[in-house]
């Protein structure tokens, strides 16, 4: 039998070790404002370029502005214009949206599936790599950027479709994060 006093000291250590082993950020949380600053400075331009290559219609001049919409859509994740499917970014909390963005970055890397072959894939790769770097820097995640595994050759159309869905979803999530942050700080 373990003494209660000893268990009282060991349990928090085990939980901390487990959290670090699983990649949980622990006490370090994301700085949403810093993430958004980097989005405005770098990722926004990369995403704009990727969306232009995708032909999805970029109609904006600044990130987060009311007229900044990559595609006609709402911010609930319930789908939107141009026949695009709904995204996985339906959370109402900034932390959940950040996790969605990070996951979508992995999806973008996976959809490129090897060395980028064309301008759209190169632009998507850039968005994914820079998004992950910002998350790692400001959110303390321990995920490292992985080289995409070479998958069996997919049909060109299905690969492009997956890439376009991931780009649409990440654009929606960034916009939703920007909108939630603006509402929270009263800058909307």
Curated annotation (Swiss-Prot):
UniProt protein name: Uncharacterized protein C20orf204 homolog
Glycosylation (residues): 74
Alphabetized UniProt keyword annotations: Glycoprotein, Signal
UniProt superkingdom: Eukaryota
Signal peptide range in chain numbering: 1-23
